[in-house]
Each structure stands twice: as structure tokens, then as C-alpha cells.
Amino acid sequence: QDSSSAASDVYKRQIVDLHAITIPYEPKELKQNTEQMAIDLLACGIDPEKSILFIQSLVPEHNELAWIFNCLTSYGELTRQTQFKDKSLTQDKQGKEGFISSGLFTYPVLQAADILIYRANYVPVGRDQTRHLELTRNIAERFNHRFGEYFPMPELKLTTIPKVMSTADPTAKMSKSLGEKHAIGLFEEEASMRKKIARAVTDSGDTPEGE
């Protein structure tokens, strides 16, 4: 998630490790992955002189604001977030301990806190995140109505490629959480990449969403 200020032109980029613990995980592996993510982002060109790169869990205000936002969000709104349904089904299919955490259900509220805590004006996301941003705007509007104008209404800024589809299932977004065969890693071996691309399910027509 990025936010920028016209005055300072500094981008805030966070590694969202709190979101990562909403599904079953190994603590040691999470720590290693978090550190590796920071290294990878810097290697990909993030400039520390122009960006603030930080780990989400090291800023406790994210959780504090998320709790306030939880109390401004209805159960019905969260049930309409399609990604919760999708991820829950994925975990069931993969047999991941048969445990669906409440954190997975409420993580869109934490996502709203991630955005609004920095009073972001624009949020660059894929098209699949539009419903989450709509929820974020609703939460900001309720907060402002109750406590006074404070949060700006963040605007959607779609990325150039709205959604990259899975190499194994053309109806799903590419995601490592679906399994190794569904995604191509940034530093994956060339032979493995070629194998996945060669086996990828393709179609001569439009994708399910015409993308």
C-alpha cells in the first residue's frame, strides 16, 4: 500500500505481516519471509531515499485504529467481502488444519486502517481490491461523521495490469496461497518458470472478467 504527500513526495510501503497471520503459518518461517520480503523489495528498486519501508507489526497504531474501525463496521459488510469466502474455501480444499480465523474475516478492517492511518489520497490496487476500498471509504465517512472531519476519502488508482491470473486456474487470481503451481515467483528458477508457463491453462477468448 502506497500513500504520498504533495509536500514531501515520500511513499509509505509496508510489509503486512499482520495480514499474513490470518491463515495458518509457522512463526519462524513468517519471520524469515518478512525479512526476505524487505530484501526483495529493495532489490526490485524501492529507493529508501524516496520511500519509507516498514513492517506493519512494528507500528502498533495500526491495530489500535483497526479496533476503532471494527466498531464502525457491520457484520453484513464483512460478509459481502468476496475474498473472505474465496480464502476460506481455499483453506478447506487444502485441508489447512480446518481452521478459519476471525482475523481472516475482519482483515479488510485492518486493511482500512493501513490506508487511513496515513491519510492516503490514492491507493494503487488491482481490480479485485475495489470492494475493500469501498469499505475503507465507508468507514472513513462514518468516522468523520461521528468524530469530525479527519480522514480524506482515498481514491482508487488501478494498476496497469489489474489482475494476473493463475497459471493453473484461469478463473482465479495468481496467488501463492493457492499453491505453488498457481504462481510464478519473482526469483524462481528459469526451468521452473518455463515449466509452469508451458503447462498454464490458456484460452483464445476473453478472461472471465474481460481482462
Where are each of the predicted segments found?
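Short, conserved active-site loops that position catalytic residues or coordinate cofactors/metal ions
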Residues: K12-P24
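Active-site flanking residues adjacent to catalytic metal/cofactor-binding acidic residues
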Residues: Q1, Q14-V16, A113, R127
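Acidic, His- and aromatic-enriched active-site or binding-groove loops in soluble protein domains
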Residues: T73-F84
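Active-site cores that bind ATP or allylic diphosphates and position pyrophosphate for catalysis
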Residues: K85-E211
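A glycine-rich helix N-cap at a beta->alpha junction
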Residues: N33-L53
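Glycine-rich loop at the start of a catalytic domain that most often binds anionic cofactors/ligands
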Residues: I21-I39, E64-L72
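Single conserved hydrophobic/aromatic residue that forms the stacking wall/gate
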Residues: Q1-A7, Y11
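Short, glycine/charge-rich beta-strand/loop segments that flank catalytic centers
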Residues: E49-N63, T82-D92
